[in-house]
Regions:
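Surface-exposed, glycine-biased beta-strand/turn segments
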Residues: 20-138, 226-241
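Acidic, glycine-rich catalytic/binding loops that coordinate metals and/or anionic ligands
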Residues: 61-66, 72, 162-168, 175, ...
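Short histidine-centered loop motifs in beta-beta connectors
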Residues: 105, 111, 146-174
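Short acidic, flexible loop segments centered on an aromatic residue
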Residues: 1-14
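Surface-exposed loop/edge segments in extracytoplasmic proteins
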Residues: 13-19, 151
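Short, acidic/hydrophobic/Gly-rich beta-strand patch recurrent on exposed beta strands
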Residues: 100-101, 141-147
Length: 241
């Protein structure tokens, strides 16, 4: 989803607002329409526009229950990841920071946690299994946007075994995103997962947005369905899907 803001510096023969905000998810089509006050005269206008490659300030479904991202009856070990920006570059931890690492002794098929549209795929990296890594950020990944504007990031795929493309609609337990790969000399399989959305900073209204540094990422701690219950994942536990 792209957020588009159109600013009119001059309008003639129309009652349109001088600032129009639209959120679009299709590659082409009509953005909006100006209607004349007098059908016998032309509409006059001058405009400029901004666009942001995100759905900013979406209406989040706080009660949504997510599905664990691996096949039924499989078990994976859950760890919580620290925010590396604070450790290595003095960046402030994002609001709500939460990122999980699901690990396994064997390759796992990874599925989406809810229905969504694939918006980004990275399949550029090979793994070095001769070393041990404290952290590893060069990971093949899939990013999926959901219909409430949240975005899920899955990282840790075998670059030759990612099965989706940008624009694909994917469903939990039905569409395999890809297969995990070992990430260092410990020979464990890992998939990292986080859920987030984009928001304006400091309660700035969307209608007042003028540049990218006025937005921020806010992370969500998802609720998952597991064994007939709705749960928050605890670190250092095995969970069966």
């Amino acid at each position: 989803t792209i957020t588009v803001i159109v600013n009119f510096s001059f309008l003639e023969n129309t009652m349109s607002s001088t600032r129009v905000i639209e959120k679009i998810s299709k590659p082409e089509g009509k953005l909006f329409k100006l209607k004349p006050m007098n059908n016998e005269q032309n509409i006059g206008f001058n405009y400029s526009y901004l666009f942001f490659n995100h759905n900013i300030n979406p209406k989040i479904d706080d009660g949504f229950i997510y599905i664990l991202p691996y096949k039924k009856e499989a078990q994976m070990f859950v760890e919580e990841l620290s925010y590396l920006g604070s450790t290595y570059s003095n960046k402030e931890e994002p609001k709500g920071w939460k990122s999980y690492s699901f690990t396994s002794e064997e390759v796992q098929k990874i599925f989406p946690v809810r229905k969504g549209i694939v918006i980004d795929v990275v399949r550029d990296y090979n793994v070095d299994t001769t070393k041990l890594f404290t952290y590893y950020n060069k990971m093949n990944s899939v990013k999926i946007e959901h219909n409430d504007g949240t975005i899920a990031l899955y990282s840790g795929f075998n670059k030759d075994e990612i099965y989706v493309r940008v624009g694909d609609v994917v469903y939990p337990k039905y569409n395999t995103l890809g297969n995990t790969e070992v990430y260092d000399a410990r020979k464990k399989h890992r998939i990292n997962f986080s859920l987030f959305y984009y928001s304006t900073k400091n309660d700035i209204k969307l209608s007042s947005l003028s540049k990218n540094n006025q937005t921020e990422i806010i992370y969500i701690t998802p609720t998952f369905y597991q064994n007939g219950e709705s749960i928050k994942l605890k670190k250092d536990f095995f969970y069966e899907s």
